[in-house]
Amino acid sequence: MDDDKGTDTAKEGCSTWCLLEAACSDDSDLDDSLEKLFEENAESDVSDLINDDDNAAQGNSRELLCQQESEECEQQIQYLKRKYNISPEAVQQLSPRLQSLNLSPGHKSKRRLFVEQDSGLELSLNEVEDFTQELEVPASAPGPAAQGGVGLGHIESLLRCKNAKAVLLHKFKEGFGISYNELTRQFKSNKTCCKHWVLAIYGAKEELIDASKQLLQQHCSYIWLQTYTPMSLYLCCFNVAKSRETVVKLLISMLQIHENHILSEPPKNRSVPVALFWYKGSMNPNVYAFGEYPEWIVTQTMIQHQTADSIQFDLSRMIQWAYDNDHLDECSIAYNYAKLADTDSNARAFLAQNSQAKHVRDCAQMVKHYKRGEMREMTISAWVHHCISRIEGDGQWQDIVKFLRYQGLNFIVFLDKFRTFLQNFPKKNCLLIYGPPDTGKSMFTMSLMKALRGQVISFANSKSQFWLQPLADAKIALLDDATEVCWQYIDMFLRNGLDGNVVSLDMKHRAPCQMKFPPLIITSNISLKKEKKFPYLHSRIYEFEFPNRFPFDSDDKPLFKLTDQSWASFFKRLWIQLGLSDQEDEGEDGSTQRTFQCTTRQVNGPV
C-alpha cells in the first residue's frame, strides 16, 4: 500500500492539489468506518440525506390524482351519452311485429366537434365505429287469400314499408306499365274540387270492386275500370265536382279499404297521350267502361275536334259576343268568354293565346265605342224603349204613383214636369228632389237610373277636373246628395249647362269635347227656394219635396216596390202621356231587322 502509484509529475499549468490521490485501505478498515457511520447520531452532517419519517405529508399528489380520475370519468360518461342511441333494429328484438310500425329510420349519433389530445384512451374510443348490428327477424308468412279477394300478405307488406305511397306507385307501374304521375296532375289541397278523378286502389276484394261498378253509376257520368290484382285503376267523371276527402270517403265506404291504400289525383285533361291512354284502354275487353267519353277526351282524340282546334283566334267574333251580351267591363268579358271554351272554338283559341290581356282590353274598348255610338244615335224615346225591352218580369206601375201621392205630390204636375225633363228642354232639364233624411229620395232616383241605365256623378270627386266625364256617356244622369258647397259649385260653373247650351267637358286622356248636359236629377236636403243666395238657379231647377219618411212593414220590407219592373210598367202605361214618340215612326214596326254586326260573318251563315 505504500507503493508510490498514480500519475507522474504534473503537467504544465496544473496546480499541485490535482496530484492528490485517494489512498487505498483494507476491507477491515472499510467495515469499521461503516459501523462508525451508523453509530453516529442523527444530528450529524449527513443525517438529512435519508428521510426515515413514517408520517410524511402527501402534499398535492393525492389531490392531483383525484382530479385526473374525475376528469377521465366525466369524459367517459360524456362519450357514452353521445354514443348511446337505441337503433330501431334493437327495439325490434322485443317483438317482430314492431317492425311494421316504423315510420322513419333512426338517426346516428353525432360526431364530436372537438377531441382532446390525451394519452391515447380518448382517441382509441373515438375510433370505434358507430355500428349497430341488424338482427334478422323472420317475417310471418302471408295469410291465405280470401275467397275473391287479396291475402293479408299484401296488406302486411304494405304496412311494413316505410313509404307506403312510393310502394303503391311502384306496384302501379309494375301492373299497368305506366307511371301514375304521368296520368295525373297533383292537387296539394284535399279541399280542391274537381269533377274528374284518377283513383288507384290497392288490396280491395274482387266482389267489392264488381259491386262498385253499379254503385258508382249513380254518382258518375263516366266510369273506366281496369284491375291487375292487387291494383285497380279507376277514372271517375262525377256528376258534380268533389274534393279528394269526399272521393276517398266514398271509396272507403264502398270497398272497405284503408285510406293509405288509395291514390287520388285529377287527370291531365290537356295531354293528348293521356287522352289516348284512356281512349284506347276502353277498347280493351278487360276494361269496364260506363257512359259517354268526357269532353276532354273527345276533343283530343276525335278528328273533327282536332281540326276545330286549329282555327285561329278571331277578335271580331269576341267583340260581337260582348256587344250582343252587353259585357262592357274587362273582367266580365274575360271571365264569361273563358267559360265558353267548352262550346265555342274561338273562345278555346282565345285561351291558347299568350296575349289574352291585350285582346280583352281591345275588346272592351271597341264595345264601348259601339255602345256609345249607338246611344248617341238614339232619341230619348228609342233609348227608353231599348232599356225597358230588356227588363224581364212584370211589375206594378201603381207602386210609383202611390209613393208619389204618399209624399204629397200632385201626380199630374209631376207627370208634366217629368215629360219636359225627358225631352231635355232648355232650363227644364233639371229636377230637384229635396226633403229630410230617410224619405226615399235616393231610393226613388237610383231605381230610375238603374232602369234607364243612367250615370251617377258624385261631388266627392269634384277635386278632379274629370268628375263630370260620365255625363258624356249618358242619356240621363243623377247627382246624389248635393250639399251647400255643391250648390255653390253649380251656381258658379254649371249654370250654362243647365240652360241646355253646349259646354266644353274635360275628358281624361282625350281632348275636351263639345256636348249638352243630359237630363239631370239632383237630390238634396236643401231647398233652393228657401236659399236666397242662389237666385240664378230658381228658374233653372224645378223642385219636388219628399217630406214623409219612407214606410216599411213589420218585416222591414218596403211597402212601395220601386224596381226595374215597376218602372218598365210605368213607362209602358204612360208612354203617350210622357210625350214619347211611337216606335213605328222610328222603324219599330215589328218587321225583322238586321242587328248591328261588327264581325265578318255571313248574315245567314252559322254563328
Curated annotation (Swiss-Prot):
One GO cellular component term noted in the UniProt record for this chain: host cell nucleus
PTM section of the record: Phosphorylated.
Subcellular location: Host nucleus
Pfam families: PPV_E1_C, PPV_E1_DBD, PPV_E1_N
Residue numbers carrying Phosphoserine: S87, S95
Region (Disordered): 583-607
Primary site of residence: host cell
Residue span of motif Nuclear localization signal: 81-83
Domain of life where this protein originates: Viruses
Protein residues bound to ATP: G435, P436, P437, D438, T439, G440, K441, S442
Cysteine pairs bridged by disulfides in the record: none
Keywords assigned by UniProt, alphabetized: ATP-binding, DNA replication, DNA-binding, Early protein, Helicase, Host nucleus, Hydrolase, Isomerase, Isopeptide bond, Nucleotide-binding, Phosphoprotein, Ubl conjugation
Subunit architecture: Can form hexamers. Interacts with E2 protein; this interaction increases E1 DNA binding specificity. Interacts with host DNA polymerase subunit POLA2. Interacts with host single stranded DNA-binding protein RPA1. Interacts with host TOP1; this interaction stimulates the enzymatic activity of TOP1.
Name recorded for this polypeptide: Replication protein E1
Species this protein is from: Human papillomavirus 23
